Amino acid sequence: MAPRAHVLVAVKELHAAKTRLSSVFDTADRTGLVLSMLRDTLAVVSDVATVVGVTVVTPDPAVARLARSVGAHVYADPAPVSAEDRPDEGGTEHSLNAALSAAAEHVRRNERGVDVVALQADLPSLRGGEFGEALAAARTGGRSVVVDHHGTGTAALFSCDPEIPLDPRFGPGSAKRHLESGARPLDGHWPGLRTDVDTADDLDAAQALGVGPATRAALDALEHTDPSRCGNE
C-alpha cells in the first residue's frame, strides 16, 4: 500500500493564541494573523500527494469555520485531561494534547494504516517539498519529531507505526519532552517547516524566508495601517 498521512493541526481559542505578539498587534489584528497563517499552513499540507486528510483540532468556532471552508475536517470536542499530563504543562497545552491524542485515535480507527502527524498551525513559510521530505524521513520508523528553529519547541510530530501512539507533549520545551519519550529527531534542512511564529522575531524570520499569500495579505494590510508593527522584510 502506498504511504498515506493524515495531518492534525491544533489551534487554541483565538483569544489565547499568540499572546507573545500582543506587544506588536492588538487582539483583532493578532486574530487575523493567526487565521491567515493557519490558512497558508493548511493549503500547503493539503497539496502534498501523500496527505489523504487534514483535521483541525480546536475549540474555537471561527477556526472551525475556516478549516471547513478549505476542506479540512474539524475535531471540535476537547478530550478529557489525564492526571499524568498535569505536572508538565499548563491548562491550555495539556487540554490540546489530550484532544490531539483523541483525534489521532479517531483517525486511526477510521483510516487503517495511515500515518499520523501533529503539525503546528503557524508555519507561514512552509513549502510542500519540505513537508513531503519530512514525511518520507519519518516513515523510516516509528515516532519522530522535527524540532523548531529555536531548538526547544516542536514543529511536527510523526507516528508512522499503527502500534505506536502519537503521544503529543506540546507546550514550552516540548522538543525535550518528545525526545525523552522516545521520538527520534529528523535532521533535514527544512527552514520553512521549522519556523513557527510565536514572537515578532519569529515573524521577521518567516518573512525573510517568504510567507504564503494569506499571511502576506494580512501583513500588507497591517503595514498599511501602521508600518512599525510588521517587522522587516
UniProtKB/Swiss-Prot annotation:
Enzyme Commission identifier(s): 2.7.7.105
Record SUPFAM superfamilies: Nucleotide-diphospho-sugar transferases
Residues reported to bind phosphoenolpyruvate: T154, G171, S174
Class in the EC hierarchy, top level: transferase
UniProt cross-references to Gene3D superfamilies, sorted A to Z: Spore Coat Polysaccharide Biosynthesis Protein SpsA, Chain A
A single BP term in Gene Ontology: F420-0 metabolic process
Origin: domain of life: Bacteria
Catalytic activity entry: phosphoenolpyruvate + GTP + H(+) = enolpyruvoyl-2-diphospho-5'-guanosine + diphosphate
Keywords (A to Z) from UniProt: GTP-binding, Nucleotide-binding, Nucleotidyltransferase, Transferase
GO molecular function, one term: GTP binding
UniProt function note: Guanylyltransferase that catalyzes the activation of phosphoenolpyruvate (PEP) as enolpyruvoyl-2-diphospho-5'-guanosine, via the condensation of PEP with GTP. It is involved in the biosynthesis of coenzyme F420, a hydride carrier cofactor.
Similarity comment: Belongs to the CofC family.
Name of protein: Phosphoenolpyruvate guanylyltransferase 1
Organism, scientific name: Rhodococcus jostii (strain RHA1)
Gene: fbiD
